[in-house]
C-alpha cells in the first residue's frame, strides 16, 4: 500500500508485493525500489524465523533436489511452506516468526518522479524493476494500457518458465 501526501510517498509493505518508482535521471527513467520484499532470503527475516524455532529451506523433490525459492517451515513438519516472512492471517506460520507487521518507508516525491508501480509477486517473479518501468514508460501515460502490458509480459514469462501461473496484479499511479 502506498500513499502520496504532502510531497512524500509513504509505502507500507507486507510480504512479496512491491512498489517501484520511476525517476527521470539524465533523460532516462530509472527504477527505484520503494519497498523491500520480506522473503526468507533476507538475512534479517531469516534470523527472526530461526530464532522463533522455524526452519528455512526450499521445497525438495523425491530425490532431495531443491525446488524453487527458500520457504518457511515448522521445525519438524513440511508446513506451511510460505515463500515470504510477513503476512496476514497465517496462524501456523506465525508460530515460527512470520509476522503481520509491515515495513513502512517514507520517501520525498521529487519533480523528476514520473510514476509508481505497485504489483504482486506474480509480476516480480520474472520481471525486474527496470523492465517493468520500461514497459509502463512505453505506454505514454495510459494507465490501463500500462497495466495490461505489464500483466501480459508477466503472464508470458510465467507460461515460458513454469507449468502454473501465479496471481498477477498491477497498479500504475502517474504523477502530475
Put a short name on every predicted segment.
Residues 1-176:
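PP2C/PPM-type serine/threonine phosphatase catalytic core
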